[in-house]
């Protein structure tokens, strides 16, 4: 059976009180709707239609060509929103999963189980339900003796007996695709809000004698919809705990899981130790037996085995095996460190490569540079790479030694095995194995202070 998905992402999200489109608010560094799309990618959905409205361009910029889009110009209810996908999906045979773009905690495993239950029950509609400790405000799921759904009743319309039910409608469904769009044509808007509600399809299917099934999510937390900043914080806390516990089960040590923020896409090898206050986001991979933190921020980077990163910021970079970074270093924009390198206190590296064994231990800026193997950059070494209009490259070849407080005015090359004396400002290439001195000779004026 072919699988389709409709993601509802057109709501304005007024309760967020934000200029940012609701489904683009991040949970552990990734927009909510992108979490949903990632899970759908894992379960073999052939087409994903995202229903957009307010802020459509921002959603399209985020998701790109991974999905298709349909625009809901007016927000006239969830049923009306799904109808916007009719041009793409009407008449096709298969199952259509309808999910909300503000449910970032839904997992591929739960969605797969929901679809499997739908097929096993030969249902036309299957509702994802959850058991709530406090069901106030949620629609209740009423089941018949056969376990199938007889109706979904909104809280305000529920009887005393129905209010006692703690199984709630999560707003996630699977529909027979052809039935879905046929039934939506019969949905009216004769209600207080004047909107077309998707759950009305359930009643239409029941009246037609079709099977309406229900599958219960493993936990209520997984089904949370984010409507305000409080729920956003709750979702992030749940996802953080879920991610950290998975990594611990895979052999990663957390000194304080509650103060460590790691996105679910991050891969970390066994016997790595994560210290408190660490943030690791994006497409980051960390090897085995590393030490990360405390208080480090790592994004979209690769860190190889046995490396140490302490109290540093690393973005879009690569750190080689057994390298040591920090404290208080900043690697960004394609900084690449080889094995056994050392980058120390208050060193910033941008768009540069360090060969194996190279060191910049203190107070340096290295930008647009190629640093060879076993090079030593002394305290205060600076690559002067920008003339106000253009960036230029600095090359320091293998085994060169650059003394303290040296300015390398790019474009410039320091040859293999060369030495640059401390305090020099280098404007011309330094030959291999040469000593370059570019500073004023010292003059002592005897008795000067007695005048």
From Swiss-Prot:
Active site: 362
Binding site for acetyl-CoA: 385-386, 422, 439
Phylogenetic placement of the source organism: Bacteria, Bacillati, Bacillota, Bacilli, Bacillales
Complex formation: Homotrimer.
Top EC class for this record: transferase
EC number(s) from the headed UniProt entry: 2.7.7.23, 2.3.1.157
Catalytic activity: alpha-D-glucosamine 1-phosphate + acetyl-CoA = N-acetyl-alpha-D-glucosamine 1-phosphate + CoA + H(+); N-acetyl-alpha-D-glucosamine 1-phosphate + UTP + H(+) = UDP-N-acetyl-alpha-D-glucosamine + diphosphate
Cofactor: Mg(2+)
Pathway as given in its UniProt record: Nucleotide-sugar biosynthesis; UDP-N-acetyl-alpha-D-glucosamine biosynthesis; N-acetyl-alpha-D-glucosamine 1-phosphate from alpha-D-glucosamine 6-phosphate (route II): step 2/2; Nucleotide-sugar biosynthesis; UDP-N-acetyl-alpha-D-glucosamine biosynthesis; UDP-N-acetyl-alpha-D-glucosamine from N-acetyl-alpha-D-glucosamine 1-phosphate: step 1/1; Bacterial outer membrane biogenesis; LPS lipid A biosynthesis
Sequence segments annotated as region (N-acetyltransferase): 251-451
InterPro entries: Bifunctional_GlmU, GlmU-like, GlmU_C_LbH, Hexapep, Hexapep_transf_CS, NTP_transferase_dom, Nucleotide-diphossugar_trans, Trimer_LpxA-like_sf
Residues annotated for Mg(2+) binding in this entry: 102, 227
Annotated region described as Linker, given as residue ranges: 230-250
Molecular functions (GO terms): glucosamine-1-phosphate N-acetyltransferase activity; magnesium ion binding; UDP-N-acetylglucosamine diphosphorylase activity
Keyword Protein transport: no
Swiss-Prot/TrEMBL keywords: Acyltransferase, Cell shape, Cell wall biogenesis/degradation, Cytoplasm, Magnesium, Metal-binding, Multifunctional enzyme, Nucleotidyltransferase, Peptidoglycan synthesis, Repeat, Transferase
Top-level taxon of origin: Bacteria
Pfam families: Hexapep, NTP_transferase
NCBIfam families per record: glmU (TIGR01173), PRK14354.1 (NF010934)
Gene Ontology BP, a term: UDP-N-acetylglucosamine biosynthetic process
Functional description taken from the UniProt entry: Catalyzes the last two sequential reactions in the de novo biosynthetic pathway for UDP-N-acetylglucosamine (UDP-GlcNAc). The C-terminal domain catalyzes the transfer of acetyl group from acetyl coenzyme A to glucosamine-1-phosphate (GlcN-1-P) to produce N-acetylglucosamine-1-phosphate (GlcNAc-1-P), which is converted into UDP-GlcNAc by the transfer of uridine 5-monophosphate (from uridine 5-triphosphate), a reaction catalyzed by the N-terminal domain.
Protein source organism: Exiguobacterium sp. (strain ATCC BAA-1283 / AT1b)
Entry-linked CDD domains: GT2_GlmU_N_bac (cd02540), LbH_GlmU_C (cd03353)
Main location: cytoplasm
A cellular component term, taken from the record's GO annotations: cytoplasm
Cofactor, free-text remark: Binds 1 Mg(2+) ion per subunit.
Protein name (database record): Bifunctional protein GlmU
Segments for region (Pyrophosphorylase): 1-229
